[in-house]
Amino acid sequence: MKLTTLFAVSVSLILSGFCSLGVQAHPVQENSSGDPVPAGAYYTDNYRNLFNEYLGISQQQTDRKIEQIWNHFFVNEKTKVYYESDDNTAYIYDTGNQDVRTEGMSYGMMICVQLDKQAEFDKLWRWAKKYMLYTSGKWSGYYAWHCTPHGVKIGKEPSCASDGEIYFITSLFFASHRWGNDGAYDYNQEAQKILKDVMSKDGSQGVYNLFNTESKLVTFVPEKIYYNYTDPSYNLPAFFELWALWSDTNKEFWKQTPDAARRLLADASHKKTGLFPDYSAFDGTPWKPKNWGYDTRRYQFDALRCAMNVGMDYYWFGKDAANQTEMISRLLNFFKQDNFTHEYFNVDGSAPAGNYSTGMIGANAVGAFALNDKDLAKECIQKLWDEPLPTGKFRYYSGMVYMMSMLHVSGNFRIIK
């Protein structure tokens, strides 16, 4: 990073305390008043290309790779997950479950705004608003978490999946700042409306706010007992920092959510392995809903995204750098000790199963932003660069996480102000 930095310490005891933990103090800058400012990309507008830093890969090579990935998932008829409909809309298709999810729709929108693909962005948003949005009833303002490719909500009043709304809101803010608000959509007002709507529920009809108002944490699902639990991978402190800055409503509440999310991620990360559970209580304890179809206390499907969330927050804001370096070091060293072999574990590392996946390779490479161990970071970055583009029936989830990870690691996943 071509920045003059100094360590954020005022006394040597603090520095020695960090060093005794094996964690380096985080570099900071000083602003014009001499006050320390974290050296995250939000403050510096400097986005690192780790492929270049660690592997010597040129910007031209990186750009070609990103274009290849775009064509793979959005253009190529044999491998894409982006499909356009006759009504000037488009959707991201979950090829494994054969449905359309707010998760994928919002990921697709984020990818499009990062790559300046406004036409595709608008078509995805048009589909989500037309088919997924509840315009009346107890879920009004929320988005049904999955639909058929023909736009029919699956099941009787399907609930929302909180990460969909989170990525919708943030991608709409970015769209507002990139393209303005005078086209097909006033993107800023679209984002503001969701932010207001999802915090306007009092529970009287069985539906609550997207965030638990006491814990300041995003809920697993804002209904029933699920309102009092979370999914660690839904906790995106870097996004919540931006909401606190840009929201027109509940600003004081949003200011409290980034640190709450950071604490949750730190609490949920196992103290030896660094592994996260798929679902947890608000204190980070692994949690499984009664009669659930699989053991959500394990590191399995959702949990792989936690490394991406932590890495993004580290390089965007750097406000919890010591904790984040420590938890990512535990996590990636655990995977290295497992020879990057398995995909699923109990959070203590027992009962390994499955094969180390494309999504894990991507998310862990984003986590490498927070590593002090440069050799391990290089190994993770190399794995991401070398990973073949996913194909076949289950290319959707791993593929979307992989594509966003490639944008992060190449310096192309940016805060669009």
For each predicted feature, which ranges?
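Extended ligand-binding clefts on enzyme/binding-domain cores
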Residues: Q29-Q68, V75, Q98-T102, G137-A144, ...
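Bacterial N-terminal signal peptides that target proteins for export
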Residues: M1-A8
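Bacterial N-terminal signal peptides
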Residues: A8-G17
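Internal amphipathic alpha-helical repeat/solenoid segments
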Residues: K65-G104, V113-E157
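Boundary at the C-terminal end of the N-terminal hydrophobic targeting segment
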Residues: C19-A25
